[in-house]
């Protein structure tokens, strides 16, 4: 079984288990609360549509849209358009985003157009080949409809997460303001229910993250399909991002990402870091709580696609 077949088989299994687990939770909640599923489903659809409509404006806020004739970034638009055409999809809108970390992402909807966002630090640290490989990955997300699929598969955990947070915050407040035993018990009950929902959400999220990681790998596969051996640059792009992020810290008081003074990085050369990744044996649980596969796993898959098992 080749890489693509393994990916598709794993995605089918992951999606099936995710849908089954979310279905069990949904039916269980409906039974406990004596609420008809005919009420729950329309409510979920409305919430999904709300997210689908507003998410492009939330995710890409502050972004600068690039046009084909842009004097500074017109080349970037043309690069995205070329990759989209080679991927046989409509070219997405292109946005440059002033953020303190290197990143690229696909977002948008079919109303306002699909979009690719690229942050300034990413443009600064990648060469053209690496940027092309990253864009081919993001275009793969659009081609595979990962924005809509990810939003759908994560809908129930998202809603449950909001409910859990609301109940626990309410419980803490009620606990602080409790004037008698009845109010105290009410506060404890709210905290307990909120915690149980949190645990259920966490378990569901494990399945969702598994599916998301597989979709990321499938987007990497699109980079290989479009660029062939040129997709090797995706591995060095990941290495540069990894090295850059080791010089990033989060202010503990404000939660704002700030660039720290340069710190010692074990492997500053991205090519050497890729070589290290290719020799790394990655545990099956290494990225279990991550939205993306562990970088070493991604590099190994890319090289396996290009060179077969001889890596």
From Swiss-Prot:
Disulfide pattern: none
Single Gene Ontology BP annotation: proteolysis
Protein residues bound to Zn(2+): 137, 141, 216
This protein's record includes keyword ATP-binding: no
Protein name per its UniProtKB record: Protease HtpX homolog 1
Compartment(s): Cell membrane
EC number: 3.4.24.-
Active site: 138
Necessary cofactors: Zn(2+)
Domain of life: Archaea
Keywords: Cell membrane, Hydrolase, Membrane, Metal-binding, Metalloprotease, Protease, Transmembrane, Transmembrane helix, Zinc
Bilayer topology: Multi-pass membrane protein
UniProt cross-references to HAMAP family, sorted A to Z: Pept_M48_protease_HtpX
Cofactor binding note of this UniProt entry: Binds 1 zinc ion per subunit.
Keyword Cell membrane: yes
GO cellular component assignments: plasma membrane
Residue spans crossing the bilayer: 12-32, 35-55, 159-179, 184-204
GO MF annotation list: metalloendopeptidase activity; zinc ion binding
One Pfam family it belongs to: Peptidase_M48
Family assignment from sequence similarity: Belongs to the peptidase M48B family.
């Amino acid at each position: 079984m080749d890489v693509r077949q393994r990916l598709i088989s794993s995605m089918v299994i992951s999606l099936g288990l995710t849908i089954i687990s979310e279905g069990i939770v949904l039916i269980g909640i409906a039974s406990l609360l004596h609420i008809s599923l005919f009420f729950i489903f329309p409510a979920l659809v409305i919430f999904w549509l709300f997210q689908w409509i507003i998410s492009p404006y939330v995710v890409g806020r502050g972004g600068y849209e690039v046009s084909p004739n842009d004097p500074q970034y017109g080349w970037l638009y043309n690069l995205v358009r070329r990759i989209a055409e080679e991927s046989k999809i409509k070219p997405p809108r292109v946005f440059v985003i002033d953020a303190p970390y290197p990143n690229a992402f696909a977002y948008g909807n079919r109303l306002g157009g699909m979009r690719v966002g690229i942050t300034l630090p990413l443009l600064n640290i990648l060469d053209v080949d690496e940027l092309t490989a990253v864009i081919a990955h993001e275009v793969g997300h659009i081609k595979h409809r990962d924005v809509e699929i990810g939003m759908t598969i994560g809908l129930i955990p998202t809603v449950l997460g909001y409910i859990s947070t609301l109940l626990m915050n309410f419980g803490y407040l009620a606990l602080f303001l409790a004037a008698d035993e009845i109010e105290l018990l009410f506060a404890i009950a709210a905290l307990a229910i909120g915690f149980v929902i949190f645990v259920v959400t966490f378990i569901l999220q494990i399945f969702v993250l598994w599916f998301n990681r597989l979709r990321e790998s499938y987007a990497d596969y699109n980079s290989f399909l479009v660029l062939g051996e040129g997709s090797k640059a995706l591995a060095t792009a990941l290495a540069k991002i990894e090295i850059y992020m080791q010089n990033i810290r989060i202010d503990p008081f404000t939660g704002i990402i700030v660039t720290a003074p340069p710190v010692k990085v074990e492997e500053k050369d991205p090519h050497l870091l890729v070589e290290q990744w290719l020799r790394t044996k990655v545990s099956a649980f290494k990225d279990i709580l991550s939205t993306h596969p562990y970088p070493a796993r991604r590099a190994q898959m890319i090289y396996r696609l290009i060179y077969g098992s001889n890596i």
